[in-house]
């Protein structure tokens, strides 16, 4: 028995993961959540259908705010069909919303990639597309990761205007290097457009990170990776995240991008609501067959993806349900792990109608057992059995 269910409905809402409860859905919304006592007393109308979750956990659907691809489909295909296929695949892994993430690329390719996502929005048959994450091109050439130096651009507001025009208001978040010349002006401009700015692929000093915070660069892309290291004489970008409680950060919980001990240490230093689980997965993640090519590079898989030419980490092979499972294996509670996968990204990306199992929130849920097997994923009230085929009851 989940002891919280006997303490009244308020305690149910405070939990990220629930059992011994009932969730009432109507159309696209959550109408009510019942503990056992209220459920037993409730007289439901005859048209209410009941689905027995057989003791599994019910949690808010996962929100992946940094994902390049999955199942052989990715943003580097420059195709709305690939984005729509990602939408169909992702419920298998508990994802109900995602933000397709674009690499730096020459201008015309970036515009093509942006238009592909825009064309897919509203036509999804699975996970919802929240918008677009631009991971460049205003990033540091000294912290590229596997991005191409030829694809970078000096800070250019006119170029940003072209991106904004192509995106038709759908750019949600953007990774930038705070130390770049003219970044202050660009940051203020982007903030005025409602874009969440993230420090990433950056060689910023601690002081430059603080300057970035002053213009609302308050989120961080894949913490520890592709950014200036923490040193006792210069805390760098990583140190700034640890020192300033207002800074939030993405975490790739595959055990490779960040040592699990550092994730536990981070939890002792940061408020939990500032930590966001992401996959940063490549199109080669769960790819059924064929050569492993991502963003034009041949990659190989060894727990995560590495570029074959120089063995540089290229991205993760993680899914969100695997990330949640890993966080629990690292020592986090299930509630903490799910909050990092749902409520926290919803809050930081300003999507307050997502990320909680409570009345008025979108009917986006994931149902999984103690072994992290997904039984159902529910997107806007549509039920996917084992996250795959939409089903009716």
Language model region names:
Residues 347, 357-393:
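C-terminal cap of metal-dependent C-N hydrolases
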Residues 161, 165-287:
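Active-site core of metal-dependent hydrolases
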Residues 1-13:
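Single conserved hydrophobic/aromatic residue that forms the stacking wall/gate
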Residues 14-59:
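Histidine-rich, glycine-flanked metal-binding segment
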């Amino acid at each position: 028995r989940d002891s919280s269910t006997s303490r009244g409905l308020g305690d149910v809402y405070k939990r990220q993961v629930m059992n011994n409860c009932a969730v009432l859905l109507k159309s696209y919304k959550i109408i009510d959540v019942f503990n056992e006592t209220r459920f037993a007393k409730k007289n439901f109308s005859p048209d209410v259908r009941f689905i027995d979750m057989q003791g599994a956990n019910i949690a808010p659907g996962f929100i992946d705010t940094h994902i390049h691809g999955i199942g052989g489909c990715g943003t580097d295909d420059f195709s709305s069909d690939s984005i729509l296929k990602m939408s169909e695949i992702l419920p298998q892994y508990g994802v109900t919303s995602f933000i397709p993430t674009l690499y730096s690329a020459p201008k015309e390719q970036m515009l093509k990639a942006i238009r592909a996502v825009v064309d897919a929005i509203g036509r999804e048959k699975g996970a919802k597309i929240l918008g677009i994450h631009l991971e460049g091109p205003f990033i540091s050439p000294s912290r590229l990761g596997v991005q191409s130096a030829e694809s970078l651009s000096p800070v250019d507001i006119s170029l940003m205007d072209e991106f904004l025009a192509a995106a038709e208001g759908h750019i949600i978040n953007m990774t930038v290097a705070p130390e770049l010349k003219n970044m202050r002006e660009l940051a203020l401009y982007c903030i005025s457009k409602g874009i969440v700015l993230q420090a990433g692929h950056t060689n910023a000093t601690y002081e430059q990170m603080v300057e970035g915070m002053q213009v609302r660069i308050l989120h961080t892309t894949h913490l520890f990776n592709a950014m200036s290291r923490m040193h006792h004489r210069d805390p760098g970008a990583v140190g700034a995240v640890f020192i300033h409680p207002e800074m939030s950060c993405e975490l790739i919980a595959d055990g490779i991008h960040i040592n699990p001990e550092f994730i536990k240490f981070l939890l002792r230093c940061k408020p939990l609501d500032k930590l966001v689980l992401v996959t940063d997965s490549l199109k080669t993640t769960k790819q059924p067959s064929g050569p492993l090519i991502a963003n034009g590079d041949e990659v190989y898989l060894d727990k995560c993806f590495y570029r074959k030419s120089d063995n540089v980490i290229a991205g993760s092979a993680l899914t969100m349900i695997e990330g949640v499972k890993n966080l629990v294996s690292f020592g986090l509670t299930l509630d903490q792990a799910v909050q990092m996968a749902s409520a926290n990204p919803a809050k930081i990306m300003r999507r307050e109608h997502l990320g909680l199992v409570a009345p008025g929130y979108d009917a986006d849920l994931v149902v999984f057992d103690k072994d992290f097997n997904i039984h159902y994923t529910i997107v806007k009230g549509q039920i996917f059995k084992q996250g795959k085929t939409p089903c009716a009851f």
